[in-house]
């Protein structure tokens, strides 16, 4: 047996996120799906393939009726912004989506407050795009021939 000591080479530190120069922004895409039952904030890379963070309004509040509320959306987007900063993302493109199809094309109550909270928490906002699915010729809407009677 040899009497010499084994020396370990110092390992390189693994840094999360891309390498960027000073003053440069790293973009992600925030997919905000605001229905009348919940608000999803889902951040991916620019291609949309890799999920970085996904938080819903329902994960932030106890009561089911509050899942889609502006308050729950605000809490969710604050969490998303914090996690994005940890990963090194400094700017976001926004893709806003309502239920769409043959249902409502209006975004739910959490959409606006989610967007505002992202901007207020220090994330730079790039493009804002509405990606609500609009039917070219849809299946029949629920409610029947005479419609929903109130």
Curated annotation (Swiss-Prot):
Q: Which Pfam families match?
A: Ribosomal_S11
List UniProt keywords, sorted A-Z. Answer: Ribonucleoprotein, Ribosomal protein
User: Where is this chain compositionally biased, Basic residues type?
Assistant: 141-150
Q: Report the SS bond pairs.
A: none
Give the highest taxon in the source lineage: Eukaryota
Q: Which family does it belong to?
A: Belongs to the universal ribosomal protein uS11 family.
What name goes with this protein? Small ribosomal subunit protein uS11y
Provide a GO biological process annotation.
Answer: ribosomal small subunit assembly
The record's annotation in InterPro entries points to:
Ribosomal_uS11, Ribosomal_uS11_CS, Ribosomal_uS11_sf
GO MF annotations in UniProt:
structural constituent of ribosome
Cellular component GO terms held in the UniProt record: cytosolic small ribosomal subunit
PANTHER family, alphabetically? 40S RIBOSOMAL PROTEIN S14/30S RIBOSOMAL PROTEIN S11 (PTHR11759)
Disordered: annotated span:
129-150
């Amino acid at each position: 047996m040899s009497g010499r000591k084994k020396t370990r080479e110092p390992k390189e530190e693994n840094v999360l996120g891309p390498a960027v120069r000073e003053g440069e922004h790293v973009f992600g895409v925030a997919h905000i799906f605001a229905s009348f039952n919940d608000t999803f904030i889902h951040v991916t890379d620019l291609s949309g393939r890799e999920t970085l963070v996904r938080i819903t309004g329902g994960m932030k509040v106890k009561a089911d009726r509050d899942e889609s509320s502006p308050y729950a959306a605000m809490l969710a987007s604050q969490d998303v912004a914090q996690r994005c900063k940890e990963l090194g993302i400094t700017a976001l493109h926004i893709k806003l989506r309502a239920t769409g199809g043959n249902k409502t094309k209006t975004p739910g109550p959490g959409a606006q407050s989610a967007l505002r909270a992202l901007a207020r928490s220090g994330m730079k906002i790039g493009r804002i795009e509405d990606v609500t699915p609009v039917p070219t010729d849809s299946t029949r809407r629920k409610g029947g021939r005479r419609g929903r009677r109130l």
